[in-house]
């Protein structure tokens, strides 16, 4: 099982949904970076469960503890360890699925691969694994902010068939995003998204959504062609998030309907800095950052756990039916933005250090 991401600035996550704790070990962070538990906690609070009627009622404080790698408020250059203890597991809710496979979940595939699985809350495949990613991502964000002024913003751009239409990304702020219960800064769309989520929830169902990401002040020249291209690593990072089923950068799939004369971003110079007049490339050309903002979108499937009765099969090769129990989000996209930001930050921090290794200046 692969639980490590990154080459220089690398994170290893550990723990299961219903185990005693989850966490991460971050290696490769340079010494001297100011880091506090409060900084990391602020990020974890954005993905924490129990935030209201639109998220799972599982009540976890997700209080983070730094175990190593930070002394007197600064990184020491040694591995940074984070731990968050699980406090509100209801493992009895999963007793029925010890022998049945939940449709849409990783249960069957884990059994096919390992011949054994932790069925409580999905075990390692649970979204609680992303706690370690967010903790490490908070450090990556702080590092990139220090060295390059890089900023990350992510929001829900659609839920089901409801799309946001009036978001001015050039003036968008985190406060505007977090003011919405669905993390959509378009007030009209936000209200309709909330209604769509509650309607699905009332039927014992769930609903999917799309999460957008904007990264500003990205250093140019990040990315390692040909196989560690910036866009390829971002795709890998995003698609590794539980429930993420699609990725596009820049104009994405819309590029297939365009002509080159439309899609090419014209280049101009201002002082000694190159810019483009449009950003169909999404900040990456040839797998290398061009200094423009990174813009990408991720599709998140509907939460697999629903209370409606579904046909399934069991470990003893019998057919049956299952209505899943447990506490789950009716729309996972609502809690995904901070995870998306964290994974993007981990990619960029690692590529930044790789670029410093490759070049003298």
Give the role of each language-model region.
Residues 1-58:
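N-terminal, positively charged regions that mediate nucleic acid binding
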Residues 10, 303-361:
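Internal helix-turn-beta structural module
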Residues 10-13, 118-129, 220-224, 279-284, ...:
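A short glycine/serine-rich beta->alpha loop
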Residues 13-14, 20, 204-207, 211-319:
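Glycine-rich anion/phosphate-binding loop at the beta-strand->alpha-helix junction
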Residues 20-32, 128-150, 154, 228-236, ...:
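Alpha-helical support elements that line or immediately flank enzyme active sites
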Residues 43-103, 107:
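Glycine-rich, N-terminal phosphate-binding loop and its surrounding beta-alpha-beta segment
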Residues 98-123, 311-328:
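Short acidic, glycine/tyrosine-flanked loop/strand segments centered on an H-E-D-like triad
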Residues 112-226:
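Glycine-rich, mobile lid/loop segments that gate access to catalytic sites or pores
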């Amino acid at each position: 099982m692969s639980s490590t991401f990154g080459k220089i600035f690398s994170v290893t996550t550990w723990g299961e949904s219903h185990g005693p704790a989850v966490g991460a070990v971050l290696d490769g962070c340079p010494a001297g970076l100011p880091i506090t538990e409060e900084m990391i906690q602020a990020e974890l609070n954005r993905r924490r469960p129990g935030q209201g009627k639109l998220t799972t009622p599982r009540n976890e404080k997700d209080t983070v503890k730094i175990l190593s790698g930070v002394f007197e408020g600064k990184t020491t250059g040694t591995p940074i360890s984070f731990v968050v203890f699980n406090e509100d597991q209801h493992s009895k809710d999963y007793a029925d699925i010890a022998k049945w496979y939940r449709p849409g979940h990783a249960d069957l595939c884990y059994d096919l691969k390992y011949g054994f699985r932790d069925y409580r809350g999905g075990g390692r495949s649970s979204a609680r694994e992303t706690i370690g990613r967010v903790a490490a991502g908070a450090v990556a964000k702080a590092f990139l902010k220090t060295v390059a002024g890089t900023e990350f913003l992510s929001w829900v751009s659609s839920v089901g068939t409801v799309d946001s239409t009036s978001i001015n990304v050039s003036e968008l702020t985190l406060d505007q995003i977090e003011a919405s219960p669905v993390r959509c800064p378009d007030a009209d769309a936000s209200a309709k998204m909330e209604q769509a989520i509650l309607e699905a929830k009332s039927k014992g169902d769930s609903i999917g959504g799309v999460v957008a990401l904007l990264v500003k002040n990205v250093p140019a020249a990040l990315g390692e062609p040909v196989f560690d291209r910036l866009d390829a690593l971002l795709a890998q990072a995003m698609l590794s998030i539980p429930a993420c089923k699609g990725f596009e950068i820049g104009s994405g799939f819309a590029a297939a309907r365009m002509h080159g004369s439309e899609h090419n971003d014209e280049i101009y110079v201002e002082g000694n800095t190159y810019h483009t007049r449009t950003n169909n490339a999404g900040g990456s050309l040839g797998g290398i950052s061009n200094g423009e903002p990174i813009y990408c979108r991720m599709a998140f499937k509907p939460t697999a756990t629903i209370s409606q009765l579904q046909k399934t099969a069991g470990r003893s090769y019998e057919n049956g039916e299952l209505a899943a129990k447990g506490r789950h989000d009716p729309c996972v996209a609502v809690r995904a933005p901070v995870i998306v930001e964290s994974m993007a930050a981990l990619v960029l921090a690692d590529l930044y250090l790789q670029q410093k290794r490759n070049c003298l200046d």
